[in-house]
A protein has these predicted regions:
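Short acidic-hydrophobic sequence patches enriched in Asp/Glu that either
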Residues: 34-41, 58
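C-terminal helical "tail/cap" subdomain of flavin- and related membrane-associated enzymes
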Residues: 32, 47-128
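Extended, folded domain segments that form the structural surfaces/walls around functional sites
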Residues: 12, 39-50, 54
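FAD/FMN-dependent oxidoreductases across multiple families
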Residues: 1-37
Length: 128
């Protein structure tokens, strides 16, 4: 069995160097967020690159803004992916209390409308 790993590089920009997608952040496959985050990065980065090249001084402020905006979204996705991984995957060292607590959390999530709504909102993502 392979461990799930997550990584976030902060910041996502250094001067003229910019990271996007898996180059800047990885998430475990549980939440299916990796490719969606990459697309969101590109969508947020394109106007900032245009602003960078529109300024003859090549001020890195637009690229720094991309980093701040992207990282807000990335950390929300990291939080969801971590939570979903710990909820849906039994850990080898898990004891009976933790297993039952995890099952109770899963039931609270799936057996109530508010739980299902919360999960759906987090799973489908937030506005870019």
């Amino acid at each position: 069995m392979l461990p799930f790993r997550s990584y976030v590089c902060e910041p996502l920009s250094w001067g003229r160097l910019v990271l996007a997608g898996d180059a800047g952040h990885t998430v475990p496959p549980t939440g299916a967020k990796g490719l969606n985050l990459a697309f969101c990065d590109v969508r947020a980065l394109v106007p900032q690159i245009a602003a960078f090249f529109a300024d003859d001084a090549r001020d890195s402020a637009p690229l720094d803004e991309y980093s701040r905006t992207a990282l807000d979204r990335v950390w929300r996705a990291q939080s969801f992916s971590y939570w979903a991984t710990t909820l849906l995957h039994r850990q080898p060292e898990e004891n009976s209390f933790t297993r039952r607590r995890r099952r109770g959390e899963f039931d609270a999530l799936t057996l109530t409308e508010s739980g299902r709504t919360c999960f759906a909102d987090a799973y489908t993502g937030w506005t870019v």
